[in-house]
């Protein structure tokens, strides 16, 4: 999948680790949670 930035990854600055996985539809898979808060963001940033 495509990596995305979780809220816990820090501000969007070059060199940040992207610990989430992008899911476009249907929310996060079972056993995962959305690790990204509100904001202009397409899909869900999910993390185990």
Swiss-Prot record:
Keyword Methyltransferase part of the UniProt annotation: no
Chief place of localization: secreted
Record keywords, A-Z: Disulfide bond, Ion channel impairing toxin, Nematocyst, Neurotoxin, Secreted, Toxin, Voltage-gated sodium channel impairing toxin
Highest taxon of the lineage: Eukaryota
InterPro entries: Anenome_toxin, Myo_ane_neurotoxin_sf
Localization per Swiss-Prot or TrEMBL: Secreted; Nematocyst
Function (record text): Binds to the sodium channels Nav1.1/SCN1A (EC(50)=165 nM), Nav1.5/SCN5A (EC(50)=103 nM) and Nav1.6/SCN8A (EC(50)=133 nM), thereby delaying their inactivation. Also inhibits Nav1.2/SCN2A, Nav1.3/SCN3A, and Nav1.4/SCN4A, but to a lesser extent. Inhibits Nav1.5 differently from isoforms Nav1.1 and Nav1.6. In Nav1.5 the effect consists in a right-shift of inactivation; whereas in both Nav1.1 and Nav1.6 the effect consists in an incomplete inactivation.
Note in the entry: vDoes not show activity on Nav1.7/SCN9A.
Record's protein name: Delta-actitoxin-Bcg1b
């Amino acid at each position: 999948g495509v990596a995305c930035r979780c809220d816990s990854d820090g501000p969007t600055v070059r060199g940040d680790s992207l610990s989430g996985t992008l899911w476009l539809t249907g929310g996060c898979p079972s056993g995962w949670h959305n690790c990204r808060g509100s904001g202009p963001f397409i899909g869900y940033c999910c993390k185990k």
